[in-house]
């Protein structure tokens, strides 16, 4: 007879916990808390987390990372000015700021460079990385000039007719002699 009462008490307790405790109406279920990138913890949250609501278990809180912590975990930074064309937007931070992360591929291409496949083309030099194994390649002035049949000179000669076909460096033109069409 005593076992019957114990069985009823255990079943009643399980039913009470699974249906939520009185006074926790409007609280998050564990699934709802997880959907908000949170977790149900007993009373306190882990460091760098904040309570974003109550869970439907008595004494449990729905804890989630702060917007700054979420942004930092995605290797982004919170900026008040918003994201640029070369950034990936990871959503809002506190105070109207945006979580932005520089996209290496967009950044490389935005500045007129190309992403190489394993290595840079002959007339380019690596200046960074688009993705692992794919360098960001910039045209190298002297190498590019040479590949086009030109020479880097302080001044293009006036005696032999030449065209300026590019720039090797600041103030140093890439000169190529004009071909006679004979």
Swiss-Prot record:
<feature type="signal peptide">
    <location>
        <begin position="1"/>
        <end position="26"/>
    </location>
</feature>
<comment type="function">
    <text>Lethal toxin which possesses an inhibitory effect on direct electrical stimulation of the isolated hemi-diaphragm of mice. Neither hemorrhagic nor hemolytic activities are detected. Phospholipase A2 activity, proteolytic activity and arginine esterolytic activity are absent.</text>
</comment>
<dbReference type="GO" id="GO:0090729">
    <property type="term" value="F:toxin activity"/>
</dbReference>
<dbReference type="GO" id="GO:0005615">
    <property type="term" value="C:extracellular space"/>
</dbReference>
<keyword id="KW-0800">Toxin</keyword>
<keyword id="KW-0732">Signal</keyword>
<keyword id="KW-0964">Secreted</keyword>
<dbReference type="Pfam" id="PF00711">
    <property type="entry name" value="Defensin_beta"/>
</dbReference>
<dbReference type="InterPro" id="IPR001855">
    <property type="entry name" value="Defensin_beta-like"/>
</dbReference>
<protein>
    <recommendedName>
        <fullName>Helofensin-3</fullName>
    </recommendedName>
</protein>
<dbReference type="GO" id="GO:0060326">
    <property type="term" value="P:cell chemotaxis"/>
</dbReference>
<comment type="similarity">
    <text>Belongs to the beta-defensin family. Helofensin subfamily.</text>
</comment>
<feature type="repeat" description="C(6)C(4)C(9)C(6)CC 2; approximate">
    <location>
        <begin position="65"/>
        <end position="101"/>
    </location>
</feature>
<feature type="repeat" description="C(6)C(4)C(9)C(6)CC 1; approximate">
    <location>
        <begin position="27"/>
        <end position="64"/>
    </location>
</feature>
<keyword id="KW-0677">Repeat</keyword>
<feature type="repeat" description="C(6)C(4)C(9)C(6)CC 3; approximate">
    <location>
        <begin position="102"/>
        <end position="138"/>
    </location>
</feature>
<dbReference type="GO" id="GO:0031731">
    <property type="term" value="F:CCR6 chemokine receptor binding"/>
</dbReference>
<feature type="repeat" description="C(6)C(4)C(9)C(6)CC 4; approximate">
    <location>
        <begin position="139"/>
        <end position="176"/>
    </location>
</feature>
<dbReference type="GO" id="GO:0042056">
    <property type="term" value="F:chemoattractant activity"/>
</dbReference>
<dbReference type="GO" id="GO:0042742">
    <property type="term" value="P:defense response to bacterium"/>
</dbReference>
């Amino acid at each position: 007879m005593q076992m019957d009462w114990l069985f009823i008490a255990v079943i009643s307790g399980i039913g009470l916990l699974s249906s939520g405790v009185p006074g926790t109406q409007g609280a998050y279920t564990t699934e709802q808390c997880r959907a908000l990138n949170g977790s149900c913890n007993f009373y306190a949250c882990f460091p760098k987390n904040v309570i974003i609501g109550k869970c439907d278990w008595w004494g449990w809180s729905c804890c989630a990372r702060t917007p700054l912590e979420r942004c930092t975990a995605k290797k982004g930074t919170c900026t008040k000015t918003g994201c640029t064309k070369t950034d990936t937007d990871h959503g809002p931070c506190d105070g109207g700021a945006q979580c932005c992360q520089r996209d290496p591929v967009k950044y490389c291409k935005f500045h007129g460079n190309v992403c190489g496949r394993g290595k840079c083309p002959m007339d380019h030099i690596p200046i960074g990385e688009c993705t692992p194994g794919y360098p960001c390649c910039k045209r190298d002035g002297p190498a590019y000039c040479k590949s086009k049949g030109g020479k880097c000179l302080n001044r293009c000669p006036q005696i032999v007719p030449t065209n300026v076909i590019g720039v090797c460096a600041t103030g140093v033109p890439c000169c190529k002699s004009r071909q006679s069409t004979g």
